[in-house]
Amino acid sequence: MSGNTFGKLFAVTNFGESHGPAIGCVIDGCPPGMTLSVTDIQPDLDRRRPGTSKFVTQRNEPDAVEILSGVYEGKTTGTPICLLIKNTDQRSKDYGNIVQTFRPGHADYTYYQKYGIRDPRGGGRSSARLTAPMVAAGAVAKKWLFEHYGTVFRGCMTQIGELPITFESWDFVPDNPFFAPIADVSALASYMEVLRKAGDSCGARIRVSASNVPVGLGEPLFDKLDADIAYAMMGINAVKGVEIGAGFASVAQHGSSHGDSLSPKGFKSNNAGGVLGGISSGQDLELSIAIKPTSSILTPRESIDMAGQSTEVITKGRHDPCVGIRATPIAEAMLALVVMDHALRQRAQCGDVTVNLKPIKASI
């Protein structure tokens, strides 16, 4: 199938192109009776929105969301919710020089080989602009999960290019354009300014977490919670790696330290990242994603044209020197969509299950 729908019971179908009239999504499976308006969705879109600082693309899109269906008198009806975001600041002429060439690192070549046709305007369907509808859908999921379980999603940047970022406090994340958990981002700004002047780009590492996640979410064997989390994160543009819990550091750990000990007072560690056997443990979901450097750069690079001949490509237009800067709200949204889908699946299959053992605390 065509791969434009994410989720099973909370299913989100994404539509649109970067330079088309609009982008959006249809959410099928949202429970009825939840209060919902654009004010519940717009704040997350504003966090992802382009043109908010000199360190991101200067494409100035308001990303104003419209609710076209699925809400009546301020409440969800249980029918499909259509969310629409109009494109207002396209500059398709910026892509005239690449109509007959393939940009290195982009989906131009593979889209053409697969479909026999491609939309060169801003990458068309492969553009990161299509993450905006997922952020909108994620806001709906976040609201339902918070109201039912108190679940809270957070994210921050922990590395940009070669610069590691030491975590100080979540409180600093909303106050700077990097979503960095530090008070002073001057070193990050200087680093990005050097890259911008050089016409180059860099990657980033993003941490995402969810707290107050109910125990029991996940469907072994093949729809494990962590499997679906990894699947969701890899669906984000430019993501090339996912770690859950201790991740690749687990290789150097011993079983005596990696296994998260349980006590009557709670878990003593969280190397598993909140998932055991593919099922949520009630601990915080903890993960990190690796984002590659932006492929659209001013540095000349070797490629081929539509005839297979050698050519040189210089990408013009307005692009993020580090796509990881705006990835935090996107990753939060995708995690929320996974948790939401599994919460509904758990309620459907195991809603009547009771056990005598009360869940222990997520941490001591």
From Swiss-Prot:
Positions contributing to NADP(+) binding: 48
Record EC number: 4.2.3.5
Stored CDD domains: Chorismate_synthase (cd07304)
SUPFAM superfamilies: Chorismate synthase, AroC
Keyword field: Amino-acid biosynthesis, Aromatic amino acid biosynthesis, FAD, Flavoprotein, FMN, Lyase, NADP
GO BP field: amino acid biosynthetic process; aromatic amino acid family biosynthetic process; chorismate biosynthetic process
Cofactors, names only: FMNH2
A GO cellular component entry from the record: cytosol
Matching InterPro entries: Chorismate_synth (IPR000453), Chorismate_synth_AroC_sf (IPR035904), Chorismate_synthase_CS (IPR020541)
Superkingdom assignment: Bacteria
Single GO molecular function: FMN binding
UniProt-annotated binding residues for FMN: 125-127, 237-238, 277, 292-296, 318
Cofactor remark from the record: Reduced FMN (FMNH(2)).
Pathway the protein takes part in: Metabolic intermediate biosynthesis; chorismate biosynthesis; chorismate from D-erythrose 4-phosphate and phosphoenolpyruvate: step 7/7
Catalytic function, reaction form: 5-O-(1-carboxyvinyl)-3-phosphoshikimate = chorismate + phosphate
Biological function: This reaction introduces a second double bond into the aromatic ring system.
PANTHER family assigned to the protein according to its UniProt record, in alphabetical order: CHORISMATE SYNTHASE
Family the entry assigns: Belongs to the chorismate synthase family.
Self-association and partners: Homotetramer.
NCBIfam families the UniProt entry points to: aroC (TIGR00033), PRK05382.1 (NF003793)
Protein name: Chorismate synthase
Recorded name of the encoding gene: aroC
